[in-house]
Regions:
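Acidic catalytic/metal-coordinating carboxylates
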Residues: 43-47, 70-73
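Short amphipathic alpha-helix used as the core "switch/output" element in two-component signaling
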Residues: 50, 72-84, 104
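Receiver (REC) domain active-site loop signature in two-component systems and cognate sites
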Residues: 66
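Active-site residues of response regulator receiver
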Residues: 63, 91
Length: 155
């Protein structure tokens, strides 16, 4: 599995993955590292928030539903420290509601600053496309070409 052609021109990113499912952490880490990115994982929102405060990350993958501090609360707190960091939400529950049903977690996450979403189980190509899209959008939005300097929609 090589680096996608679209990613070859990007500065490889430092990515934080926050998910309580160790299998998901491992899968995402493997896919992203094979694509050349540096990956740090955390098993809950509090640990992720702590790492976010000490690391310089270009992108955050964040599970919505975790015990303790859920993804929504984690996202609120990350936004206070890093208002421009691109966040991709991931969840095993349906993210978007069918018309006429509630709740719509994607709308909630978008209001808190998520720029993209993936529903588990996701295809490796979808994960890599979401990362590439977010990093390219952030690069275009940043005059200094640093992915973490600007956030643009990367859906």
């Amino acid at each position: 599995m090589g680096i996608p052609a679209a990613a070859e021109n990007l500065t490889l990113a430092r990515i934080l993955v926050v998910d309580d499912d160790v299998a998901v952490q491992s899968t995402v880490r493997l896919l992203l590292e094979r694509a050349g990115h540096s990956v740090v994982t955390a098993g809950d929102g509090r640990k992720g928030l702590s790492l976010c405060g000490t690391g310089d990350f270009d992108l955050l993958f964040l599970d919505i539903f975790m015990p303790g501090m859920d993804g929504f609360e984690t996202m609120r707190m990350v936004r206070q420290q890093h208002p421009l960091m691109p966040i991709i939400v991931i969840s095993g529950r349906p993210i978007s509601a069918e018309p006429g049903t509630a709740p719509d977690f994607l709308t909630m996450a978008t209001k808190l600053g998520a720029v993209s979403s993936l529903q588990k189980p996701f295809r490796p190509a979808d994960l890599l496309a979401a990362v590439t899209g977010c990093l390219e959008a952030a690069k275009r939005a940043s005059p200094s070409s640093q992915p973490s300097d600007g956030v643009a929609s990367c859906r």
